[in-house]
């Protein structure tokens, strides 16, 4: 895990947002929760506007925080798959509520 985890947080929400906050992490987790195992290129296609550098960074952080698993297959061409860990799967109800809230409020923006 990252060294910043040792930081003292004012509340559990702050800690949670440190792990899943930002523009891309919740969306990456959402797609892995709904679609299951995905390869890097598949994730990249789903996230319109994300750069290669940003996607790589977000995936590395999610993996370091124990929310996703990276499976590397030693073959030609190289193959890497991403999936939710058990810890990552515990976020599914939160992601579902975020989706529901978005569906109910998106048209009002």
Question: What is each PLM-predicted segment?
Answer:
Residues 1-9, 46:
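Recognition helices and adjacent regulatory flanks at domain boundaries
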Residues 7, 73-74:
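Short loop/turn motifs at secondary-structure junctions and domain boundaries
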Residues 8-11, 93:
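N-terminal amphipathic/basic helix or basic patch
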Residues 11-54, 75, 81:
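N-terminal helix-turn-helix DNA-binding core of bacterial DNA-binding proteins
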Residues 55, 59-62:
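Basic amphipathic alpha-helical segments that dock to polyanions
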Residues 63-71:
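A short, conserved structural fragment
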Residues 65, 94-106:
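Alpha-helical linker/hinge and terminal dimerization helices associated
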Residues 74-97:
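Basic, amphipathic "hinge/linker" alpha-helix immediately C-terminal to the N-terminal HTH DNA-binding motif
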